[in-house]
Amino acid sequence: MRRLLIVGLVALSCGLIARATEEAAEAVPSFDEGVVPEAILQAAIEARDLPLGERMERISRPMLGMPYLVDAVGEGKLPDVDPPARYDVYDCLTFVEEVLALALPADPRSAPMIRNQLRYTGGEMDYTARRHFMLEQWIPENIESGWLKDITAEFGETHLIEKQVTPRTWSAWKHRRKFQLADHELPTGHYALPVLSLDAAIEAADQIPPGALILTVRRSRDHIPIIVTHVGFVVPSDDVPRMRHATKMGRRVVRDERLAWYFDHVRWYDWWQVAVSYTHLRAH
């Protein structure tokens, strides 16, 4: 039987949210004012006193059915002139970032500050500071900065997926040219993620709290720097555990899946073995 792995569960630190929210009250970028659609803004306002997982579900509910489009956001300036936020299309990461940015602060007008803290090193909106790569940047830097906490071990025996990334790894990668970064700006080093086996993940599925992020991870290959390929989150459900994500599968939209179905679907990918990760976010 093929083996699917589930990577580190993460929780959000409360103190950093509060600090970023206070800063955002004084420094909301003007280019984001008025961008959030009324239905999403109203959902964020009405849900702000709910537990975090429920807030994420309510806020993202109006996004269901929105088209999937990869790399639709940028800094509004060269080298990526796309706007910092869009609500008509999403890829998997921008969907998660936007939901978190709206769910975490008490006032959704603070969303740009929260988004920038999650997306950029130091919170500075600059292409070279963007956390382009999940394994090498987005996950470890958000853990180091205090936003995230790995809680994988709470749900079973963990294993490590390890990856050595060198300049040669980047030069051999066929998608290297898509990133407007100098060679020295690409992350290198040894990276590792704690994981659960698929069997352990399925067994623990009912224990995973709403708001937990799900990271899909492929088996490491020497010539490919990317192993984390997808992200979504667990939503509250009255019946079976479900995830919500912006996906290329099927109709290429934001949609919900039964976790059991999703695990069964990805376990049989023949062209690359896949892995999944849950991450939990602590409400403040």
Predicted features, each with a name:
Residues 1-3:
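Positively charged n-region of N-terminal signal peptides that target proteins for export
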Residues 217-276:
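C-terminal soluble interaction/assembly domains
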Residues 7-15:
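Bacterial N-terminal signal peptides
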Residues 60, 64, 68-79, 186-228:
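Catalytic-site beta-strand/loop segments enriched in glycine and acidic/polar residues
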Residues 71-191, 209, 245:
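Acidic/His-rich structured neighborhood in mature extracellular/periplasmic domains
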Residues 279-284:
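Conserved small/polar residues in nucleotide/adenosyl-binding loops
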Residues 18-24:
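Boundary at the C-terminal end of the N-terminal hydrophobic targeting segment
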Residues 24-94:
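Cationic-aromatic interfacial patches
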